């Protein structure tokens, strides 16, 4: 059970956050992010790709949509280009967006202004409205093209976050490593939490 740091019973006032789950390996990162945000009382809008559904089935043996329905009533396929998140007014009234995991294809589309689906279009809206956008990249190694795309977005204020777990937390299991990545992504949106053990020197 995750609780907001510094509180016992108070849940954070409900705010809207968009979570994108692309077809990169590491679907569990997206699911865990949604779980934590749900516990913190956020209104969560989730955009998923067809590839993400396949990856979830392969890596976790689950139906991704059925799993996400436990935590949110707002689930969109990236082909639903007409859905509410495609409007820039939606991003203006949202706290932020995290694409976790973010595939290299999705990174490239966003970096080059290609809003061919709901996921990339929504991300572009967050950039043009100067709202917080976090891209959690899991791919390795990264070549010059991927790094240039990431640099282009970083210069625009987008947070580029590699899914690189820390070992100073002395993880006891894979959940500790997953929670560290998710917690770091939430940090970038300014969300208070106690999901992982912070470095104290």
From Swiss-Prot:
Highest taxon in the source lineage: Archaea
Keyword Cell cycle: no
Keyword list, A-Z: Flavoprotein, FMN, Prenyltransferase, Transferase
EC number: 2.5.1.129
InterPro entries associated with the record: Flavin_trans-like (IPR036551), Flavoprotein (IPR003382), UbiX-like (IPR004507)
Coiled-coil features, chain-numbered ranges: none
Entry binding sites for dimethylallyl phosphate: 168, 184
Binding site for FMN: 23-25, 49, 103-106, 138
Signal sequence residues: none
Catalytic activity: dimethylallyl phosphate + FMNH2 = prenylated FMNH2 + phosphate
Keyword Protein transport: no
EC top class named in words: transferase
GO MF assignments: carboxy-lyase activity; flavin prenyltransferase activity
PANTHER family (alphabetical): FLAVIN PRENYLTRANSFERASE, FLAVIN PRENYLTRANSFERASE PAD1, MITOCHONDRIAL
Family named by the database record: Belongs to the UbiX/PAD1 family.
HAMAP family: ubiX_pad (MF_01984)
Function: Flavin prenyltransferase that catalyzes the synthesis of the prenylated FMN cofactor (prenyl-FMN) for 4-hydroxy-3-polyprenylbenzoic acid decarboxylase UbiD. The prenyltransferase is metal-independent and links a dimethylallyl moiety from dimethylallyl monophosphate (DMAP) to the flavin N5 and C6 atoms of FMN.
Stated name of the protein: Flavin prenyltransferase UbiX
């Amino acid at each position: 059970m995750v609780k907001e740091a510094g509180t016992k019973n108070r849940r954070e006032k409900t705010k809207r956050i968009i979570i994108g789950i692309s077809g990169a390996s590491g679907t569990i990162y997206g699911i865990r992010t949604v779980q934590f945000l749900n516990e913190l009382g956020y209104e969560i809008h989730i955009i998923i790709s067809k590839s993400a559904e396949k990856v979830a089935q392969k890596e976790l043996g689950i139906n991704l949509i059925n799993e996400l329905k436990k935590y949110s009533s707002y689930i969109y396929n990236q082909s639903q280009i007409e859905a509410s998140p495609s409007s820039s007014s939606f991003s203006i009234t949202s706290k932020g967006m995290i694409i976790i995991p973010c595939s290299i294809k999705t990174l490239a589309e966003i970096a080059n202004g290609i809003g061919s689906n709901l996921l990339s279009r929504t991300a572009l809206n967050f950039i043009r409205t100067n709202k917080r956008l976090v891209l959690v990249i899991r791919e390795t190694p990264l070549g010059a093209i991927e790094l240039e795309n990431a640099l282009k977005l970083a210069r625009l204020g987008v947070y580029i976050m590699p899914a690189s777990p820390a070992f100073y937390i002395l993880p006891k299991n894979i959940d500790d490593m997953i929670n560290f990545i998710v917690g770091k992504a939430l940090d970038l949106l300014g969300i208070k939490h106690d999901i992982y053990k912070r470095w104290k020197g």
